[in-house]
């Protein structure tokens, strides 16, 4: 967490991004009771905060913050997170993760205006409804280059991470911004574009290109200007949002190789074109209309022939016309300038405005109806003239085309009349088409302008699309939007978790696949599969007579009862009607299909389109230049009556799916970043948040699932080499130096040696995987370690400098003592007479000798100087030679490496080719076998097709014959009208009853059965009519009696029907109640699993804290050792100082001796000394310059070496990233190939399923005929069915009571657990006290460490005390750690095993059904992908394999290079240390010279003082001499000089004192810093102690409660699962029986009506019915036997399962006992038990699948036999009917007079029957044509498969040839390798010789330096000897003078 100082870079945005330090400290210190602080469910606010008052009987009493008291169930109370998690930036880090915690975290952050929050891998943003300063330029710069964890959540952080990932990973990126309308998607999209335009500017100056008088901007300006233009034409005011985007867009921003902007393009989706002609009251149309009418540019008003009042134009004035937050005038200026910046020509700009104005005029076109006709005609031509003028059309032609369009009939065009309504609809469709096409053209034109043709490498895509929509009325638009979000959510899940888990398996990590219930494949395939919703919709659009109801019926026939995601909608009062419901991931959505066919076809007037194409307005002609019937870009067409979907007829849904597939392809090729936008309230109030609205959006966006996924898996991973390189610093001793070790082993050793939770990471084959947060912890540890190393290095350096300074101070003190001693001695002897004489004579003796000595010294100095220059020149030459040799050496190494890499690449490529050849041969064999199977299946299908065609032709002939007979009967019926007048009234009543019965039948039957039953009924009527011709006389007498009987039976049937309906409603209600109970139990189970996962995470956190505590103890031990080392160093330095002091004392004695020997000095001696000092200083400066130059060259060499090493490291990192990316792509390609292979295997199964479907259709036809014979028996069975339903409903109620009892039992168990938790809390408090004592011991240890620095005398005793304290602490920590580790391991393993067992049992029943549905639904899609992509995929795989091999080889070579460079670095480091040692020795010598110089200055001062005294004495002695005056004058001058020198010496002394004070200040500052560091460490330790206490309390409470909860939880779940399975079985049986009863009731009514007409034929049909009944009984008996066998097998499996459960428990107990003795074998035993469970479950699943497959095979055989027998029966019945019809024809003449009396009664009924029969025949013919089309398409697919097989064979031949060529290349390369190896050896020898030569040169240089130092020493010795000789000469001279 950043400090307030670090947040200062964000400027005024800082408080809107992150909490301040003060607020964080207050949150940590805030009192909190984890037991009672909860969230509670509340009806109004969804969730509120409260405190628990009491718990009784499964109920909890909670007092809310508002003071209210609520009593709720246990499952409606959720624990609250500690205060430190308040306003947390990443919600995945929360301890308790549930809906109220997420909601209140967002709410509290929103209240503080922190609108961005991380949620796992994605970012959640809440619309603030106000301006916030979080997008300022300083914020952009602050986020640039920051990692995600280094900065607060922000859209800029997401953008910068995407940009950095693109640069580092070399991979395309995408940012997916989703949310509801008004949530802020468009604003965030703008901010993303703003960020990229700011940080990735091209850097070019603005270019002004004059194109038709317009000035274009730079690429950045054009990208930013695209938004105002698109918003003007694509945004509008809605109820929720004043600037709502009514289209989706995907903006791709392309970058060059350097990361600069290169180009951009935009793709749009689902423009809401209906808004052009219709708006709701609170909304308005697109902004451009109101901008034009704002009169900001009056020339537009004149040009477009419009007014400034929007109410004059109905198309744009149906809602509001102004928006308070939008200034239309200013927006028009922005739009107009955007058009100019984007490079539109003036002509194009005028065209845009004209077409917009024409759309406005279209709304004013009026038409009226002609008198006495339905034909429409124009009502005035003024508006049409304006619209035609703007579009450059003829108004008369336009009106004619609208009112009298030309329609193609056959090969000719016919003029068709239109009604007013049709013309009005056509005008609206044209307006919408013109606007939509213009919008899409503008987007394409913008893309053309943004494509700068610059080189581009990668792109970042920004997706702004509408979120999931659930309204009261949902139409086709909502289905498209929801389907898009379904695909995006599946992409999100696939990216976040499916790919993650697949990578775990590839990497060899032990992982159990976790299904989070978010698999959306079933819903997606239901919508887009070949027989899905979109497919059926497009098929219906092909038929001219199709209606919305026929579309609905087809949906029900295809999916109802077959797909779990397709349901009938529930009827809710007050809501619009819904026709079907889909189960989406965000909820159940009811859809209304009214008008879907018209919306999908989107018809246009062909004649008007033809006029548009010929328009003089080029833009309009270009928009409609595609085809006469539409444009694929506009996603519509006007071709009517087409039966096949071709290029000229592309529906809205087809275009939408095409665009969506392109979008998903783009997204899959990128690395996605997700942003979820949330709308806080419906009233646009800043700061207010509606809980229910936000929760609904969180569920729709999958926020909670995303967090759970992130926490469950291993979201962080890193390559072993990268991990070793980056984190080796954490424990360098774990990886041995000087020997090679594999990166994986090194990483394992390194992680094992670090104090972290070892369950939080896993080792794969190439990477190490981490749980969420662990990598951040390692980064923190690394930063801390680096900080420690830096502080340790700084401490060493500062200590060294302090010791040097201290040494100087000691030397100064000793020298001061020496000077004081000498001065005192001198003051004692200076008045002695002999000393006065000595002072006078000594200078005279030394002057001559000193001159000679100085001359010799100058000569020697000049010689040494020349030698030094020569040595420097030689050294430079040698260095230049060394540099050239190093360059040559590097070049040779690079050549060798490149050649070696080429050889290795060739070898690996050859190996890969051989492997791929073998794999391809195996795959080709499999493909050929599958192709043969498909050919056989195809042959069988063609034979069946031919049989069906023959049968259909025979049926057509029979139908024709029946139609002829019916026509004859109609003629005879008209002749007998007069004879049946007295019976017409009774027949009319009979007809009414028949109509009522048919209506009731239609209501009870389902859609597909209705059509088939009607056909059968009509055939029965025809049969009865033909037979009735022979029996009309007998029926006349019986009609009246039968009518009465029929009325009675009808009344009985109505009463029975009412009873059945009541029973049905009761059963349905009971079923709904049971389902609700089941859902509640499932939710409880999920919550329990969630609590278990939370407890596991707490245990892991507790372990991590224990490890951190142990780490601190180790750090303290290390600190003690460091202090001991410092004490030893201080002792050594003290001994060294004593030694130096003794040396100085000796030197002082020597100086005193010299002083005694020395005499007075004259002015000439003083001048000579000054000259000598000047020359000495010059020599010293020359020496210092030489040393500085040498150090500068050494530093430059070191810097150059470090830069080269850093560059190589960066190159290695980049190559490793590329390698990682290629490995990822390689694994993905392999997965796709495996999927394709598995899909090819399932094609044959799919065809078998298709055959089964055909057979089932045939069986349904045959079953209808057999059911006709069973109807009498089924009527009697209805009453028994009803009784059975009543008993079953009673059984359900009893089961419901049992469930309620079970729930109460669970609540009692939970109450017992709470009591145990309270006991554990008391124990926890005792442990806290013990822990505080431990913390006190640690503080005392730290205090002892501080005392070590001050108390040197007591160091041994304090050390012993610290060791005792630390050993005690270590033992206690070890005990706690072992205790917690053993308990946690045992309990976590038990929990994991229990969880796995429960998950397997819960999902066992669903996995088989889901797998079968997924396989069947994906067959067609997989087959197409296989045929289209196999060849491309194989090529891609070969390329990626070769690239991966090359990169692997390069990686190995770079590792070798890196090792060599490391070795060289160590060598240079050693040389550097040697040079530093030499520099230090030179520094000490320089220090000695400085001391000598200071001593000479002191001597000079004493000499001057002595000189002064001597001159004073001489002036006293020579008062009587005449030259006394002159002497006095000279002495005064000398005095002034001496005083000046004295002042200079005093100034120097003051400077030395100031420097001493400065050094003392430094020491004080260092001490202050040490104190601050100490206080900071104490504060951090205190904070950690508090965290340890809190987590320890949570851990103990959770661990103890889980042990008691586990057994009860397992028992309750087992009971619930058994009860659930039983209820599901009973429910399925009830549904089957209910459907069966409905079907039988309908068929009974139909049979009753038919039996009255054929009384004499009952005996014949009775015999047939008895035969059919016997067959059915046999079949029923067989089915029952099979069911009994299956039930017995299920019972056996259950028994075995229970037995295995008992054995598992026994094994677990034995395992726990053994683990106490041998902990090393514990993990092996648990893994064996887990594999055993998996194998048992797999065996049971395989057995179940085998039984299902065998059952399906038996059913298929039986259905085939039955179909053959039914076909034979149908043929026999057809022959019989032909015979009877011929017989009836012969008897017609004899019975003609009798028939006329009764024929009139049946007139109306027969007409109705005939009409229905014809319709059914037409439907059957259409169905036959559809089946023929399907068979033809299947044949085409088989032909394509054969072609693909041939392509594979050709490819195999090419590969074999290529392998032979590769072998030859390998032989050539082998020879080349031998030659290169010889060259490498020679180069190595040359390099070694060069290195030896450089070493010799260095040694020579060092030798010269040493000789120079010796020469200087010799010069000093010579100078001292010269001084002695001068003294002696002066003594001799005085003796001679005295003798004279």
From Swiss-Prot:
List modified residues, type Phosphoserine: 392, 625, 1093, 1097, 1163, 1238, 1244, 1289, 1293, 1304, 1307, 1496, 1515, 1543, 1555, 1575, 1601, 1715, 1727
Concerning Pfam families, the annotation shows: Myosin_head, Myosin_N, Myosin_tail_1
Domain Myosin N-terminal SH3-like, residue spans: 33-82
Tell me the InterPro entries matching this sequence.
Kinesin_motor_dom_sf, Myosin_head_motor_dom-like, Myosin_N, Myosin_S1_N, Myosin_tail, P-loop_NTPase, XRCC4-like_C
- List of residues binding ATP: 179-186
GO cellular-component terms in the record? cytoplasm; myofibril; myosin filament; myosin II complex; sarcomere
Q: What is its main location?
A: cytoplasm
- Keywords linked to the UniProt accession: Actin-binding, ATP-binding, Calmodulin-binding, Coiled coil, Cytoplasm, Methylation, Motor protein, Muscle protein, Myosin, Nucleotide-binding, Phosphoprotein, Thick filament
- Parts forming coiled coils: 844-1940
Limits of the IQ domain: 786-815
The UniProt record lists the keyword Cytoplasm: yes
Q: Which residues carry this modification: Phosphotyrosine?
A: 389, 1465, 1493
Which BP terms in the Gene Ontology apply to this protein? muscle contraction
A molecular function (GO) term:
microfilament motor activity
Q: Where is this region: Actin-binding?
A: 660-682, 762-776
Q: What residues bear Pros-methylhistidine in this entry?
A: 758
The N6,N6,N6-trimethyllysine modification is found at: 130
Location comes to: Cytoplasm, Myofibril
Which residues does this entry mark as bearing Phosphothreonine? 64, 69, 419, 1242, 1256, 1287, 1468, 1502, 1518, 1731, 1737
Protein family membership: Belongs to the TRAFAC class myosin-kinesin ATPase superfamily. Myosin family.
- Quote the subunit structure annotation: Muscle myosin is a hexameric protein that consists of 2 heavy chain subunits (MHC), 2 alkali light chain subunits (MLC) and 2 regulatory light chain subunits (MLC-2). Interacts with GCSAM.
Q: What does this protein do?
A: Myosins are actin-based motor molecules with ATPase activity essential for muscle contraction.
Comment on protein domains: The rodlike tail sequence is highly repetitive, showing cycles of a 28-residue repeat pattern composed of 4 heptapeptides, characteristic for alpha-helical coiled coils.
Q: What is this protein called?
A: Myosin-2
Q: Which organism is it from?
A: Bos taurus
Q: Cite the source lineage.
A: Eukaryota, Metazoa, Chordata, Craniata, Vertebrata
Q: Which gene encodes it?
A: MYH2
